Amino acid sequence: PTYYDMVKDAIVALKDRNGSSMQAIKKYIEANQKVEFKQHYLRAALK
């Protein structure tokens, strides 16, 4: 899946009332996806 889709899935799964932090999204993606994590892709997907 694309980073955009992974970020969207993480935000929906985390269900944080005040929004999900970048750290929480990163942790969720690392735990649930089998990809090599790239920080700059996460930042781009969040914009």
Swiss-Prot record:
Main localisation: nucleus
Occurrences of domain H15 (ranges): 1-47
Residues passing through the membrane, by range: none
MF annotations from Gene Ontology: double-stranded DNA binding; nucleosomal DNA binding
Location of the protein in the cell: Nucleus; Chromosome
GO CC annotations, alphabetized: nucleosome; nucleus
GO biological process, one term: negative regulation of DNA recombination
Keyword list, A-Z: Chromosome, DNA-binding, Nucleus
Family (UniProt): Belongs to the histone H1/H5 family.
Function: Histones H1 are necessary for the condensation of nucleosome chains into higher-order structures.
Name the record gives this protein: Histone H1A
Source organism of this protein record: Olisthodiscus luteus (Marine phytoflagellate)
Origin organism lineage: Eukaryota, Sar, Stramenopiles, Ochrophyta, Olisthodiscophyceae
